[in-house]
Amino acid sequence: MHFLSKCVSMSFADAVGATKEALERQKFSILAEIDMRQVLRSDLSVDFRPYLILNACSLPLAHRAIEADHVIASMLLCEVVIQEHRNGRVEISVLDPTSTIGTINHVEMISIAHELQSKTRQFMDDIHPAPEFCRAA
């Protein structure tokens, strides 16, 4: 699978805010927000680094996808991960939607995936103009 990923020179909290703003500018709706640090702490008593998952969706594209194929459409949701690595670097990543749909022989879904890829790249570019080298540690 292929991911779009970048490290940014801002705090985790600022990266979360910048990501949400960039998603909004590209007309994505945030359907769910999962604070993995909190979930792991409360359910497993594990102290984990800041790690947030945003379940984002372009509603017009989701509607088209559901109309085209009600099962395959589930593959087009964007799971945006914002995490702070142990070295302090903050990374934002999302699965490239064309990597999940590329093997499916469904013309409309492939078209939707390419449109979603374009919107995904745009919101990633909008977050921070100059990404930093990102090396998890």
Where are these regions (language model features)?
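Short glycine-enriched loop/turn motifs at secondary-structure junctions
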Residues: 1-2, 24, 46-49, 85
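Terminal, regulation- and interaction-focused segments at domain boundaries
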Residues: 1-26, 125, 133, 137
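Solvent-exposed residues in well-ordered beta-strands and their adjoining turns
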Residues: 9-11, 57, 83, 95
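Short glycine-/small-residue-rich flexible loop motifs, especially phosphate/cofactor-binding loops
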Residues: 20, 37-38, 121
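Compact, glycine-rich, soluble single-domain proteins
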Residues: 29, 36-39, 43-81
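Short, structured loop/turn "capping" segments at alpha-beta junctions
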Residues: 29-32, 130
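Beta-strand/loop substructures that line and gate deep hydrophobic ligand-binding cavities in soluble
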Residues: 79-106
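Well-ordered alpha/beta subsegment
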Residues: 103-137
